[in-house]
Amino acid sequence: MTTLIHVLGSDIPHHNRTVLRFFNDVLVQEIGFLAKPKFMVVTKNRALLDDCPALDMAFFDSKKSLAQAVIAQACSDRDCRFFFHGQFNVSLWLALLSGKIKRHQFWWHAWGADLYEDSQQLKFRLFYFLRRLAQRRVGHVFAVRGDLYFYSQHHPNVPTSLLYFPTRMEPALTIAERVPVEDGKMTILLGNSGDRSNRHITALKVIHKQFGDKVRIIIPMGYPENNQVYINQVEQAALSLFRPENLNIIKQNMAFDDYLALLRRCDLGYFMFNRQQGIGTICLLIQFGVPFVLSRQNLFWRDLIEQQVPVFFAGNPLDSQLIAEAQRQMLSLDRNVIAFFSPNFIDGWRQALAKAAGEQQ
């Protein structure tokens, strides 16, 4: 059986903690590993992640130090295999491209952002070119249906498998009916973070054109840190279009329960990112019967359509009647069978890890 080492190669606390807790709390019980799953993790706050006793974890304080350790391990033991969860570490892509990490050692669960090329800055355009070259050398790619479609268009000869991120979900939260708001005013959730990929200002203009200034807008911008300049730009644009009392720009990180309460108050989600992201928030909205608008360039719509989840596309006509009908359709869905919901994605992980460990061809 192949020695398998899981790699979280960038310091993304929320996502990394979700993966680690999923392995520690769920997969260890579901699969019954012969040995503790091995993880190599970048983090500046070990205490946040170091509560998974069922895992064998090695921590690194930088992307560079982790990459050096991965490369050293790959070169010293060509029979070991790495399962990269997401991949925002330039050094690891370059190691794959140069052959320091071999194709059969590099299995990858793509998280969306690392497939797409948003920035126009010269240094990023150069990196995108090198990353495209490296991605054709991956041994096996796991991703959502839409991202597999995108990847296979560029690299048709690389083996792929469907796999969903282990979104933190509680099936008991799924509601059967929605309570109408007393004042009848629509509440719209704009974006899933303060990242520029949400295209907040463009979305604000589109929302104003569709609904005027008589809707409530909630914009969560607590993540990423040190983002005040962009937050100010979004706030200025929002105030030029909507009344202050109809705006709620959240500038701090929220506790998970507070975030759930916020989502329950919404009537519509608006996500303009031109790539797959925000699946966690989308899953929660589906649980709460809240429809949403996506960019057609966010290929997760393929997964949604496959699971019969109603989707609005940015640029299409939209009014309160269409939204109410989408809410009705969403509430009538059997949400217990949606493939990317917990616990349904567990079987995909069982199969993926069996393949990666050489137990399944």
Swiss-Prot record:
Catalytic activities: beta-D-ManNAcA-(1->4)-alpha-D-GlcNAc-di-trans,octa-cis-undecaprenyl diphosphate + dTDP-4-acetamido-4,6-dideoxy-alpha-D-galactose = alpha-D-FucNAc4-(1->4)-beta-D-ManNAcA-(1->4)-D-GlcNAc-undecaprenyl diphosphate + dTDP + H(+)
This protein's GO CC annotations: plasma membrane
EC number: 2.4.1.325
Protein location: Cell inner membrane
Gene (UniProt): wecF
Pfam family, one: Glyco_transf_56
Enzyme class, UniProt record, top EC level: transferase
Record-stated family: Belongs to the glycosyltransferase 56 family.
S-S bridge residues: none
Membrane topology: Peripheral membrane protein
GO annotation, biological process: enterobacterial common antigen biosynthetic process; fucosylation
Keywords from the UniProt entry: Cell inner membrane, Cell membrane, Glycosyltransferase, Membrane, Transferase
Keyword RNA-binding assigned: no
Name of the protein in question: TDP-N-acetylfucosamine:lipid II N-acetylfucosaminyltransferase
